[in-house]
Amino acid sequence: MLIVISPAKTLDYQSPLATKKFTQPEMLDKSQQLIEICRELTPAQISSLMGISDKLAGLNAARFSEWQPDFTPDNARQAILAFKGDVYTGMQAQDFSAADFDFAQQHLRMLSGLYGVLRPLDLMQPYRLEMGIKLANPGGKDLYSFWGDQITEKLNQALEQQGDNVLINLASDEYFKAVKPAKLAGSLIKPVFLDEKNGKYKIISFYAKKARGLMSRFIIQNKLTKPEQLVDFNLEGYEFDAGLSAKNELVFKRAEQF
């Protein structure tokens, strides 16, 4: 099984590293093209494009300016340890064993507006470039047109390397839109996480994001390789609901959190 998740806007380049192993991103030539486009933007344009404050726009203008593709442990960090959003809070990669990192490197991929597809141990320099923004480029009006089929092709390579044809979609809709399901060399399974609120079960964004990380951790730490094993997921109170699930959509429910 190959898991795909979204990146995070929040980054951590200070915490102690849980592993010294690293690899290089595989699509840096494309990243360089995007960086050159982004370097033409003023901080005001970045603020408008990304919907962020002037302070954050200045920070990201500086990141674009300082970015260079010679990644080392001194100027970059492994992606799985650099991202720090809700998904990564659930995953807790800082507690992974060497065997966990090895399994994740084979079975987990992070989608990225700048880097396309990242493996967990791929070094990355800090950036903010969300997949859904309207950044004009030679391929078209946005990043979906820039990446085209390349993200799907990279995932197909990973599926072939890790030995089966099942892709577990734990990414957000914004990011998974960069994948072309019709061109995937495999079948898709999407876990869905419902939380109870006032007696009704629904997707609550904060909880769902963390649950995607929890599911990733569950697969990685238990070294799961078959889709039928996913129904055993039970971290932090979630339980599989067979009645609501379908072949390609696994539904997990949790009672209200107080």
Swiss-Prot record:
Gene Ontology process terms (BP): response to hydroperoxide
CC terms in the record's Gene Ontology section: cytosol
Family according to the record: Belongs to the UPF0246 family.
Protein name listed in UniProt: UPF0246 protein YE0603
Organism expressing this protein natively: Yersinia enterocolitica serotype O:8 / biotype 1B (strain NCTC 13174 / 8081)
Lineage: Bacteria, Pseudomonadati, Pseudomonadota, Gammaproteobacteria, Enterobacterales
